[in-house]
Design a protein with these regions (language model features):
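Mature catalytic core of soluble alpha/beta enzymes
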Residues: 1-187
Length: 187
């Protein structure tokens, strides 16, 4: 976590390279695969922009165009090298695994439950819901998708088994300045 001074992510961001745990290396490799498949639409090097806009510190602000252009110089998943447990970043780059960490965590929780002999479960990590098996009565799990325009309503319900349902929206992490809403989903 970028908010934890002792985390692998913080150490890599501070030093530009180093050895990480097997688990962090696994998550980073998975993130790199997703980045490649999405042609960079998902990119763990987004951290400089998240920090610039204040989403990492809650000191929100609209940065100048020149600041954004400067931060963008370090944003590209191709600036990350993962070789075993060794990670290196190109100068000016820094990472944030927040976009993949909850999904990984819910998968690990499900695996631990399976290893303990549990046959039916739903794990809800707020925006990340993962289910395995069916409900105990044999029916599918039902997962509601929140309506971003109305906190107490939903857009629809998915019936599913053995799947993850992951959502993210600008209605949870955002700030307003001069009548304009700015959210944490950055393109």
């Amino acid at each position: 976590s970028v908010g934890n001074a002792d985390s692998d992510v913080t150490k890599i961001n501070e030093n530009g390279s180093g050895e990480v745990s097997e688990e962090t290396a696994f998550i980073m490799n998975r993130a790199m695969q997703v980045s490649e498949k999405t042609n960079g639409a998902f990119d763990i090097t987004i951290y400089p922009l998240m920090e610039l806009w204040g989403f990492t510190t809650k000191n929100y602000r609209v940065p100048e165009s020149s600041e954004i252009a400067e931060a963008l110089k370090g944003v590209s998943y191709t600036n990350v090298s993962v070789n075993g447990q060794q990670v290196a970043l190109t100068s000016g780059s820094s990472i944030d695994l927040g976009g993949i960490a909850k999904g990984y965590t819910s998968s690990r929780v499900i695996q631990i439950m399976k290893d303990c002999g549990i046959e039916h479960a739903i794990v809800n990590l707020g925006g990340n819901v993962q289910v395995f098996g069916t409900k105990t009565d044999g029916s599918d799990w039902r997962v509601a998708i929140q309506n971003p325009a109305s906190e107490n309503s939903y857009l629809g319900i998915l019936s599913t088994t053995d799947k993850a349902v992951i959502t993210s929206g600008g209605y949870e992490r955002y700030f307003e300045q001069d009548g304009q809403v700015y959210h944490h989903i950055i393109d």
